[in-house]
Amino acid sequence: RYMKISYNWLKDYLECDLAPEAVAEALTSIGLEVDSLEQIEEIPGGLAGVIVAEVVECVEHPDSDHLHITKLNTGDPELLQVVCGAPNVAAGQKVLLATVGTVLGDDFKIKKSKIRGVESFGMICAEDELGIGESHDGIMVLEPEAVVGTPAKDYLGLATDALIEIGLTANRVDAASHIGVARDLYAYLKHNNIPCKLNIPDVSAFAEGEGEAIPIEVTAVDGAPRYTGTTIKGVKVAASPEWLQKKLLAIGLRPINNVVDITNFVLHEVGQPLHAFDAAKIAGGKVVVRRAEEGEKFVTLDGVERTLSAADLMIANAEKSMCIAGVFGGEESGVTEATTDVFLESAYFNPVSIRKSSKRHGLKTDASFRYERGADPLAVEYAARRAALLIQELAGGQIVGKVQESYPEKIEKKIVDLDYDRIEGFVGKKIGHEVIESILEALAYEFVEKTETGAKVAVPSYMIDVYRECDVIEEILRIYGYNNIELPQAMRMSVNAPQKPEPEQVRKSIADFLAANGFVETMNNSLTKSDYYSKLKTFPEEKCVRIMNPLSSDLNVMRQTLLLNGLEVIAYNINRQINNVKTFEYGSVYSFDPSKDGKTLDSYEEHTCYALFISGQPDKSWRVDPGKGNYFQLKGYLELLLKRFGCDIYSLETEAAPADLFSEGLAYNLPGSHQPLAVMGTVAPARLKQFGIKQPVFAAEISWPALFELVKRNKIKYKELPKFPEVRRDLAILLDESVSYADLRKSAFRVGKKLLKQVGLFDVYRGDKIAEGKKQYALSFVLQDLDKTLTDNDVERVMSKLLSTFQNEFGAVLR
C-alpha cells in the first residue's frame, strides 16, 4: 500500500530546509521506502517560457482591421516583434508573453509564425490561455511595477509541491499520516544535528459545551475498546476553503464538503480515522455500537446492498444500522448540504474484527487500512478535538454537551527493559549510551527508569509493532543509520577448514531434482487456522504456537506441518479445474511444549522440512498412458531423492505412518538414532474431507535437519567401474500376505553378501488361483563379481542360498 505525502503539507508540521529530494532520501534511509517523487504544479508545466514583457510599440496591422504589430522589451537588447489580436493591447503595458517553444495547456506549442505577411515571435496571453482564469476579452494587463523578464510563475506566485509516495509495510501504520512521517523525519534530523522543529497542532482550545449530547451505548466492547462521540450543532455544510481543497487534491482525494473534507484531512494528518453522521438521521437520538444480526441487509455509501454477518461490528441508531464500523459508511446517515447537526465519531476498533469485515465484504478503505493494522488508541481524543475545532472554524456550529466516551479498560503504553551493552552487541558497534538515549527521546520514547547499564522505556502508543528489546534496537538502528555501521577491517576465519556440504547447495540440488521431475514449488503462509489441528493426534491443537494479536482467526497459529498447507493448495487448484497437481514446498514448522510456561524460548521449537504432493492424472498422450499418481510413484521419487545423497531407503528403520494423517504409509527413521527422517503415504479420507478434496492425494514430509545429517554422513567415494559382466536371475515365490518386500530384500543382501548387487520386485499377484491370505512375488536379482566372471555354478550356489533363506525365514514356496 502506498502512502501519499504532500511535501508542502509535511512542512506544516516539520520546519526544516530540506528539499523534496533530500526528504525522500532521508525517509528511505530510515525504513520508509520512497517509491516515487513527483513534482506538482498549480498549473501543469508551471508556465515555463512565459515571462513579463513591456509593450514598447503598438501599431495597426496594414492588412487587418483588428490585428496589431507590437514590439516588446523582454530584457534582451533587441525588441521582440509579436502580432497580437487583442483589442486592449497598447504601448506602455506590462503583459505576459509566451515565447517561442512554450507549451500552454495540454499541447498548444508557441511557434514562430507569419500572420498576414508579418513575422511574429510569440504570443501575448489572456487569462484563459494561461489557465489562471476564464476571461478571453483581452490580454492580461499587469501592474506597472511588474519587472520585465520575470518568469510568470514567480510573478503570479504559482504554488509548487512534491508528492512523495511511500511503500508502507504492514507494521508501519504509524507512518500512515503526515504527522507520522514528520515524527520519523524529525528523529532522523535531530540525530544528524540538522536544524528542525516539530509542530503538532494545538487542540487546547477545545471546550465542551452546554446541553445534551447524543448518548452512546457500546454492547460489543471487544470490537470497540474505545469509542467517542462529539455532538456539534448549527453547522453550515458548504464547499471547503481553497487551502483545504488543495491539500486533499495534492494527495489525490476529491473534496466533497467542509465537514467530510475535515474528517479526511485529519485522517491524513494524524492517521486516526473519523466518521461524521448527520445527527438528524440518528433515530431514537442514540448511537449504538453492536454486532450485526446474521443475514441483516445494509446499503453502503456506494449504493450496494450487503448481507451482514453476526461477526460484523456496526454503528447503529435505535432502529437500524448506519455504518460498518471502521470500514464503510451507510447511504442514509451521511452528511449532506442539508445537514445542520453532526455526530463526530472517533474510535479504536479491534483490528481483527475490522480486517474480517473488510475482507468479507471486499471493501478496502483508508479507514479499514489503518484500523486493521492497529490504529493508535491514544490518538482517539486528540483527533476528535482537532476535527471538532476545524468544523467550528470552517462550518460554524457549537459543541453540545460533553464528549461521550466508552473506554472501560484503559490501554497502557508498553514498557520495555533495555540493556545498553546488549543493544551495542546487536548493532555491532559501540555507539554510546548518550546516542541511544538521544535517539529514543527523538522518537518520543519516555524513560520510566534509567541506570548506568540500561533503562526502562515506555513505547509510544502509535508504534504498534514494538514489544521487545529487539524491536527497540531496530528503531535505534534505523535512525542511527545502517550505513553508519562499518564493516570490520579484518575477518577471522580458518584457511584449513575442511570442505563441508553447504545447506544452500543441497537445497538447490533438491529443488532442481523435484522441478526436473515435474513438481512445482509452492510457498505458503506460515500462519494458518487452529481449526485444522482440532482433531489431530499427531499435531494436537495444544501444541500450536498461537499469535498474540492475529489479524484473523484464519491466521491465528503457526503451522505444525506443511501437509495441511499443501492440501489447501491442492483444493484451491482442483476448484479451478486443475486436477493434476505435483507440488513441493520447503519451509519452517513450529510447535509449543504445553508442559512449559511459554515464557522462555525453550518452550517453542522451530525446524524446517520438505513436503511433496501428488494427486490426479496427467494429460493423456497418444504414445503412452501416463497413469494416475499413486503411492508407489511418490515412494519412487522419495527413493531417488535419498539415493541422490547416498542413502538407500531400505537401510532406514520403518514404522507405520500416523493413522490420523495417512490411511496407509510408512515413517522412516535414521538407523541407530531413531531420528525421524520422513513420513509418506496416502492421505487419510478425513483429511481430504476437511479440505473438500474428492480425489486421492499422496504426500510425504521430509525433515530437513535429518536429511542434511544424511548428506553429511555420506561422503563421496571413488568406485572403479566393473570389468566383468553382471548376471540376472528371476525368482517367483508364494508368500504369506504379512511378508513385506523390504524383509525379503534385507535377507537377500545378508545372504548374497558381496556378489548380490541389486534386488527388484517386478510383479505381484493376488487372486483366485492362489490360496486366500497368500500372494506371489516375482523378484529379480543382479549378481556380479568384481574380480572374475561368474560361472553358472557360482550363480546357482547364490540363488540356492537365497531360496533356502526365503523358505526357512518366511515360509516361501517356489512357483
Where are these regions (language model features)?
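Conserved mixed alpha/beta core segments that line enzyme active sites in large multi-domain catalysts
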Residues: 51-83, 149, 245, 257, ...
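A carboxyl-terminal module marker
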Residues: 4, 441-448, 469, 524, ...
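Glycine/proline-enriched, intrinsically flexible loops and inter-domain linkers
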Residues: 7, 25, 30, 42, ...
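Mobile "lid/hinge" segments at catalytic clefts and subdomain interfaces of large enzymes
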Residues: 116-131, 135-141, 152-162, 166, ...
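Extended, well-folded interaction surfaces typified by the phenylalanyl-tRNA synthetase beta subunit core
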Residues: 416-581, 729, 782-786, 794, ...
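Terminal amphipathic helices with adjacent charged low-complexity linkers/tails
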Residues: 185, 189-219, 395-423, 430
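Phosphate-backbone binding interfaces of nucleic-acid-interacting proteins
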Residues: 2-207, 343, 362, 366, ...
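Beta-rich nucleic-acid/ligand-interaction surfaces
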Residues: 42-46, 205-207, 266, 494-495, ...
